[in-house]
Amino acid sequence: TTINGIKIEPSIDLYLISLGGFYRFGTWALSNRPGQNGPSVSIDGTAGGRYTHINVDLDFKGIGTLSGNKDWLDPVVGMRTLFDLTERWSLTLDGSVGGFGVGSDFTWHAGGLVGYRFDLLGEKDAKLFGGYRALSWDYEEGRGRDKFEWNVVMHGPILGLGITF
């Protein structure tokens, strides 16, 4: 990027750690065939925290570099719906909101995943999943020259592997 003839090269590193737990409100069969393990749906309430760390470097070529970092912890609550479509295939829809002025003023997350269970170390103890996720922050701290503002929405594909112990 060039502004007023000055070449600027930005670099942003973002680290995110989400930890939490869930409470299963219930699981319901989606099939009315007695004695059969058919499709089911489970609904969970979730709660936890989302830690965010950002490191920003602005290299003004020929002039110098500005850099800084910021980190904060957001409390989050949400809901998750898990559709067990077959013994191996599943669909998960989840979302959360948080911040509440503790870390961010507001943060949210929404995602959808398709999963496939398989045998890794035991019976159906692993799940390969892929889908799409969006994550947003509205974070502000400081004033004047010391003001830091992070109002960002990130979204894109997600791939992962989960292992159950």
Listing of model-derived features with the role each one plays in the protein:
Residues 90-105:
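Transmembrane beta-strand segments that form the barrel wall of outer-membrane beta-barrel proteins
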Residues 19-23, 47-49, 77-83, 112-116, ...:
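Residues on the lipid-exposed face of transmembrane beta-strands in outer-membrane beta-barrel proteins
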Residues 14-20, 42, 72-76, 105-111, ...:
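Transmembrane beta-barrel architecture of outer-membrane proteins
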Residues 45-51, 81, 93-97, 112, ...:
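Transmembrane beta-barrel strands of outer-membrane/channel proteins
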Residues 110-165:
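Predominantly the C-terminal beta-signal and adjacent terminal strand-loop region
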Residues 1-16, 53-70, 100-103, 137-156:
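Extracellular/periplasm-exposed beta-strand and loop segments of Gram-negative cell-envelope proteins
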